C-alpha cells in the first residue's frame, strides 16, 4: 500500500502486510498478521501478531514499542478476541448477501476500531485496470474504540459518509473483498484501488 493522490504530497509512506487465517463457521479466524512500513521521514517498523484460538497472544515489533505502549495479555484479549487484524477486517464472508450489513472490527495490537456502514449496498460499475467490474458500494465511517489520539484526522474519518468501499463477491472464496476504498482525510481522499482481478 502506498499513499496516493494529494495525500502523497503530505504523507509519504509504504506499507506491506500479510494476513493468515482460516474460515470457521462463516467467520474469518486470524492466525498470524505481519506488517511493515516505511515513511518519507525515514522511520520504519516491522512486526507481527500471533493468535491462538482467535485471540492475539503476542505482539512483536522491531524496533520495539516503548514500554508504556506494549500491550498486556489482558488488553490483547479484551480488544482482540472479537476482532480481526486490520486487513482481514476488510473482508466479509459470503453468508452476507449485503456486505454493508457487516460491522467489521479491526485490531492492530494497540488500536481497535469498527467500520460501520450507514445504508444498504448499491450496485455500481467501476473500472479495475481494463476490466469493468460490478460492485456493491458501501458508505460508512470508522468508530475508534481504543488507542487513538484526538486529531483532525480522527474527527474526519468518524463522520458518516467518510468511508466508501466498493465490494466484489468472489465465488471461489465465498468472500466479499473491497476492490476500491476511499477514506476522507483533512488532506483529501486516501484511495486504495486494485490494479487487476482474478476470480
Task: Describe the function of each predicted region.
Residues 1-51, 98-199:
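Acidic, serine/threonine-rich low-complexity disordered tracts
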Amino acid at each position: 500500500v502506498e499513499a496516493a493522490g494529494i495525500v502523497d504530497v503530505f504523507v509519504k509512506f509504504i506499507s506491506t502486510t500479510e494476513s493468515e487465517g482460516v474460515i470457521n463457521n462463516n467467520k474469518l479466524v486470524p492466525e498470524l498478521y505481519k506488517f511493515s512500513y516505511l515513511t518519507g521521514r525515514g522511520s520504519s517498523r516491522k512486526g507481527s501478531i500471533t493468535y491462538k484460538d482467535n485471540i492475539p497472544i503476542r505482539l512483536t515489533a522491531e524496533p520495539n514499542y516503548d514500554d508504556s505502549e506494549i500491550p498486556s495479555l489482558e488488553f490483547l484479549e479484551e480488544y482482540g478476541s472479537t476482532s480481526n487484524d486490520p486487513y482481514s477486517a476488510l473482508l466479509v464472508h459470503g453468508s452476507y448477501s449485503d456486505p454493508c450489513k457487516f460491522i467489521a472490527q479491526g485490531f492492530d495490537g494497540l488500536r481497535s476500531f469498527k467500520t460501520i456502514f450507514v445504508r444498504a449496498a448499491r450496485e455500481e460499475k467501476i473500472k479495475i485496470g481494463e476490466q469493468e467490474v460490478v460492485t456493491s458500494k458501501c458508505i460508512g465511517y470508522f468508530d475508534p474504540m481504543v488507542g487513538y489520539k484526538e486529531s483532525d484526522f480522527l474527527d474526519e474519518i468518524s463522520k458518516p459518509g467518510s468511508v466508501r468501499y466498493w465490494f466484489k463477491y468472489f465465488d471461489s472464496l465465498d468472500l466479499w473483498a473491497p476492490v476500491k476504498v476511499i477514506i476522507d482525510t483533512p488532506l483529501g481522499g486516501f484511495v486504495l484501488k486494485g490494479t487487476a482481478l482474478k476470480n
